[in-house]
Amino acid sequence: MKHLFLAVIAVLAMVSCGNVKEKDIETENATGVVLVQNQSYYEVVLSNGESIFFSGFDEKEGINGIAMDEDSVKASVSYGTGFFISNDGQIATNAHVVSNVVKDKDVNKSVAKVLEALKRLMAMAYNEYDEKYNEAQQAYNIANTDPDVSYDTFYRIRDYRDAIKEERDKYAQYYYGIDEIRASESEIKYHNKVSIAYNNTFVTNTDDFVSCVVTKTDTDHDLAIIQLKDKLTPVGKHVFEVSASDPLEDYSFTDKLTAKLSDDKNSKVFMTSFNLGPTLALTKEGVKSQFNSGSISQRTDDRLMYSIPSLPGSSGSPVVNHAGQLVAINYAGLNNTQSFNYGIRVKYLKNLMDK
């Protein structure tokens, strides 16, 4: 009887070691996630050797934040979530969070749209200056025939008219010069700066973010690895284990026993993220992540669908099971709902790490 009692105690102990308490998962994972910030802009190197710059491009809206020189372009700022996967400062996230995901086949189409949009802007600018020039010409004609106008006033009016004409003619040259540019021979370059903010720290501006470099990307599976420049994961930060085997398929004896006597380790999944980036994350106590749970509703070879609510900003979040094992990297929500989301299965992150 004593041996039977001890055996039961041993089994219960094994089961208790299987699944992890939700609060413990939340506490541990919160120390390993980071808020990822991406400041980016585009450069179009035209076939004539000149460059134009813009903040972003959308097929429906066209270009926005256009500038003729690099110093005046306003960078677009976006946010996502990342998590530590090594002790040397490596962080996993989505490729679309930290890199340009425009495919080469779309570049020429985008350049053509940029040029068309630029022509419209040049035409608008020309018309604006042409109107000013006509007004200045009228003032010049009056000053030229009015004996009461002093020479100083006349010369100021003339110089103003000439300056307006020079600006107007410059935009005319730009407009007709664009017609000679071949979109197929132009190139889009993506410039960006990636940085992170640690969970549970104070962030008041972009200078409080820590710089990183993008080291690896897998655009086919929307995965990326970034790394702290000093290659040192801070002490006390949880490092997520990226298993060589898939936790959704690999069950230890303890996992099987726990599933029979309690809950399957994959019956519930948890996500730690920064929904809406700093909009929700910034609190009086500093940057705070959100913790949500749900269940897996569908599996494919490369993706999971689960009922975890999320908002933009959660891209790149770690998704773990009830045993605390990393099973997926969150990357997209279904249209018109925040209640069902997709994640990339962890095996593809492992493949990227091993490259």
Residue ranges and their predicted role:
Residues 20, 99-181, 327-355:
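C-terminal cap/linker of serine protease catalytic domains
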Residues 222-227, 303-309:
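Short, solvent-exposed secondary-structure boundary/capping segments
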Residues 1-4, 82:
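Positively charged n-region of N-terminal signal peptides that target proteins for export
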Residues 19-22, 45, 77, 203-207, ...:
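Flexible, gly/ser-rich surface segments that form the specificity/activation loops bordering the active-site cleft
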Residues 36, 82, 89, 93, ...:
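Terminal peptide-recognition signature
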Residues 19, 89-103, 136, 143, ...:
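Conserved active-site neighborhood of the chymotrypsin/trypsin-like protease fold
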Residues 9-17:
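Hydrophobic h-region of N-terminal signal peptides that target proteins for export
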Residues 17-95, 181, 185-199, 206-215, ...:
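N-terminal activation segment of mature serine protease catalytic domains
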